């Protein structure tokens, strides 16, 4: 899927996460998992991280397995006060 072919924000987020995984996967398994989580923690705003966890909660379809593993090390955003 090229970056021009997104059908939804969800597909774009999956695409972006998989691009990050593609970059880090050459570093070996553990370094890749840590690198993916570190990148998402540093550069993704809380709303994007929340969306990541929503997609994973529904099965995580389309994610590189490294992204799914790295999610355990990604900071969960705090719930908004109502």
Walk through the language-model features, giving the residues of each.
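General marker for long, soluble alpha-helical cores
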Residues: 3-30, 54, 68-70, 81-82
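Amphipathic, hydrophobic secondary-structure cores in small proteins
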Residues: 21-65
């Amino acid at each position: 899927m090229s970056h021009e072919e997104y059908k939804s924000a969800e597909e774009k987020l999956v695409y972006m996460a998989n691009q990050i995984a593609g970059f880090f996967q050459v570093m070996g398994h553990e370094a890749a998992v840590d690198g993916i989580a570190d990148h998402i923690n540093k550069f993704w705003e809380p709303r994007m991280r929340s969306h990541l966890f929503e997609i994973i909660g529904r099965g995580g379809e389309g994610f590189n397995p490294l992204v799914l593993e790295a999610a355990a090390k990604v900071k969960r955003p705090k719930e908004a006060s109502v």
